[in-house]
A protein has these predicted regions:
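Catalytic loop of the DD-peptidase/beta-lactamase superfamily, centered on the K-T-G motif
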Residues: 1-145
Length: 145
């Protein structure tokens, strides 16, 4: 299963995914969590059953991975009575590094493009209705100039 980058900070001994729930060990306990992101809204629900603790975070900023910082901080405070870790700082630094790497990769990709070349077809040539026997029809429309 593909896990969230925050696993680099929690360093679980085991991790799994089942029926919509990410699961891993956190501070010696099983943590189940589920995330959602749609239409500019995000959420995370985390449960440590053995500590009788659950955390729900809802926000109106898509891809705001601060939700992980809030969940782990709340778990530390309520399940383990521990306020020693600055989750906000750690997760901010982790994701800032990803944004920097993404910008560098884009710059490298543009620099490596073969000069004087272009796509085989114009962007508008991809417009149309496509059909798949299992998935049905999809309309592709160009929104670029």
């Amino acid at each position: 299963a593909s896990f969230y980058p925050t696993q680099q900070l929690t360093k679980p001994n085991w991790k799994t995914y089942g029926l919509g729930w990410f699961q891993h060990d956190y501070r010696g306990n099983k943590l189940d969590f589920h995330t959602g992101s749609i239409g500019g809204l995000i959420d995370i629900c985390g449960i440590i059953r053995d500590k009788n603790t659950a955390v729900y975070v809802f926000a109106n900023l898509d891809h705001a991975e601060l939700r992980h910082a809030i969940m782990y901080k709340a778990m530390d405070l309520f399940a383990f009575d521990d306020d020693s870790r600055d989750w906000h700082k750690e997760i901010f630094e982790l994701y800032s590094g990803f944004r920097k790497k993404q910008a560098e990769d884009l710059k490298k990709s543009k620099a490596e493009r073969v000069a004087g070349t272009s796509s085989t077809l114009s962007k508008n040539a991809y417009e149309g209705t496509y059909e798949h026997p299992m998935l049905g029809q999809v309309l592709v429309k160009a929104f670029w100039p």
